[in-house]
Amino acid sequence: MTASTDHTYEEALQSLHFAAANADVPDAQLFGTLVTARAGRNELSLLGLSPDQFTGLLARQFPHLRSVDTVALTSTIAPLPLSATHSAFVATLHARLMDDANPAIARDDADCLAAIIAHACLRPDHLWRDLGLDGRDAVSAMLARFFPALAARNVAHLRWKKFLAQEVAVSLGVPPGPAPGCPGCEDFGFCFPRA
């Protein structure tokens, strides 16, 4: 980025922070948190959204965000190169989440959130940290709202990333194992003592 584009991006990020902080809709607050967590580190590509998905999400959740800010933020999104294994995991988890999407939620919003969650499972930390949320309870509330049937299946109260990896394994008909990002987590040995 040049100094000019850095400044434009920083202004756009400030506008997004303001829009998220002043959102009167819980979903806008959630998406504001998810997006600003990555935008603040210039990691919007890690959300796993295409530029069109990202632009649509901003338009739906933050309709008062200036178009110049949307363009500045969207211009930093590049396709994520994923290995075949990671790509298959993301696609399977995304489909599994969408199978359980709350019909009362806008389908495009559920689709964006499913992509964000699936891509967060590739990173090496607890899911709540990878999403930029403030704890497991925030992940539980998000999943209960957007994917209630899936959330209800976690009767053993597994850590969410581990549970989602098990959902992928069930979909693929393979033995359960860790999500791609799990081996880098500080608690990997706790979640997978035999791995």
Predicted regions and their residues:
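Hydrophobic, aromatic-lined core segments that form the binding pocket/scaffold
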Residues: T2-L164
